[in-house]
Amino acid sequence: QQRYLNAKRYVKLAIVADRSMVTKHNGKLKKLRKWIYRIVNTINEVYRSLNILVALVYLEIWSKEDLINVTSAAKDTLASFGNWRATDLLKRRSHDAAHLLTNIKFDGTTVGKAYVASMCQQDSSVGINQDHSKINLLVALTMAHELGHNLGMSHDVVNTEKQCNCGTCVMAPTISDQISKLFSNCSKNDYENFLTLYKPQCILNEPSKTDIVSPPVCGNELLEVGEECDCGSPETCQNPCCDAATCKLTSGSQCAKGLCCDQCKFSKSGTECRAAKDDCDIAESCTGQSADCPTDDLQRNGQPCGNNAQYCRKGKCPIMTNQCISFYGPNAAVAPDACFDYNLKGEGNFYCRKEQATIFPCAQKDKKCGRLFCVLGPTGKRISCEHTYSQDDPDIGMVLPGTKCADGKVCNSNRECVDVNTAY
């Protein structure tokens, strides 16, 4: 658990500057870009104390017209920006969070707004920020604050439930001239709770050099174009393989970090760098030519798994018993075959396929690929055929594709029980 919490995280940030920002900078886009690069450099500096690096991987400037309605109603603007990000921006450029920078003044004292504990979510990993000051640092700290909300942090307050050790830290409810670049004990706890509870996956991946769109800064711990390594400032760098002042490898070094970098040299070819997680995963080994561990690979579909009783599909070993356990708890088991005869009826929730409003019953050979039936605990004389159904998601409670339905056979995505060799 502690290792998971201590792992370095990378927020790959997309920033959108709206039309009002272009007007504010008199149409000088180069000047506007520089202003934003400075903001991101400060945000990265602020977050390094939490072992988070923030990299600008995309910058979009709406120089002709706004692509959403940016208004003084912060709540509405945030909602439409989140919606636009999910339906438009994400399809064009991969990133973890998107923030809008605007010169429109929000109602009341609001200078920014963001969804809380939403990092990595499609329509809510967003924030909006008002470019409210001539001082770059104050705008950067506003965006750092809103990004903090995305990462699960609430405001620093002192009340009966919460005693925060700082009144002027990044997550202070209001911005002041005394504002600091530090995070309070409350923010650190909130962030750790967010990691534990939500397990956001997207921020575990390091951006590649070519993903970062801001000019390289030696000493910011991000590996950028033109750098061989970046271990932070000369004062804080503790990596003997990297010259902190130049961001070049020290003499005789082949690498400075990576799963296949051992004491500044590439690990020997064949050295395991990522163990197989389970039957459907493959262990990866170093090539001897690179500091990076090869891409995580999976066993081929149809590879036997689960004591040779099941078959792999997309890196998972779908086992019917486990599907019952996930719905009904540890005492659940797959129901007897007789329960699956309900799927032959093709009525109510019992079928193999449903297209629009039409229900297709299962053929006899496919009955174990339709609705899943389970029993709870030991069975007596009477068996109740337990099943699960959801109005919102018709796939919930159905046997998962890839599940074994007979010897040498699996359910395909059409819910037919087919030979494992033809399924894949």
Curated annotation (Swiss-Prot):
Which segments does the entry list as coiled coil?
none
Which amino acid positions bind Zn(2+), per UniProt?
A: 145, 149, 155
Main location (coarse class): secreted
Q: How is its activity regulated?
A: Its proteolytic activity is inhibited by EDTA, TPEN, 1,10-phenanthroline, and some thiol compounds, but is enhanced by alkaline earth metal ions (Mg2+, Ca2+, Sr2+, and Ba2+). Its activity is not modulated by urea (4 M).
Binding site residues for Ca(2+) 2: 217, 220, 222, 224, 227, 230
Copy out the cofactor comment.
Answer: Binds 1 zinc ion per subunit.
Q: In which tissues is it expressed?
A: Expressed by the venom gland.
Residues modified as Pyrrolidone carboxylic acid are 1
Q: Where does Ca(2+) 3 bind?
A: 281, 284, 296
Query: Where's the motif D/ECD-tripeptide?
Result: 279-281
What are the Disintegrin domain coordinates in residue numbering?
Answer: 215-301
Recorded GO molecular functions are:
metal ion binding; metalloendopeptidase activity; toxin activity
Positions with a binding annotation for Ca(2+) 1: 96, 202, 205
| Residues modified by glycosylation | 69, 185
Instruction: Note whether Transmembrane occurs among the keywords.
Output: no
Q: Name one GO biological process term.
A: proteolysis
Q: Where is the active site?
A: 146
Q: List the disulfide bonds.
A: 120-202, 164-186, 166-169, 218-247, 229-242, 231-237, 241-264, 255-261, 260-286, 273-293, 280-312, 305-317, 324-374, 339-385, 352-362, 369-411, 405-417
Assembly behavior? Monomer.
What's this chain's function? Non-hemorrhagic metalloproteinase that degrades fibrinogen. The alpha chain (FGA) is rapidly degraded, the beta chain (FGB) is degraded very slowly, while the gamma chain is left intact. Shows a prefential cleavage at X-Leu bonds. Cleaves insulin B chain at '29-His-|-Leu-30', '33-Ser-|-His-34', '38-Ala-|-Leu-39' and '40-Tyr-|-Leu-41' bonds.
**Which family would the database say this protein is a member of?**
Belongs to the venom metalloproteinase (M12B) family. P-III subfamily. P-IIIa sub-subfamily.
What's the name of the protein? Zinc metalloproteinase-disintegrin-like brevilysin H2b
Organism source for this protein? Gloydius brevicauda
Recall the taxonomic lineage recorded for the source organism: Eukaryota, Metazoa, Chordata, Craniata, Vertebrata
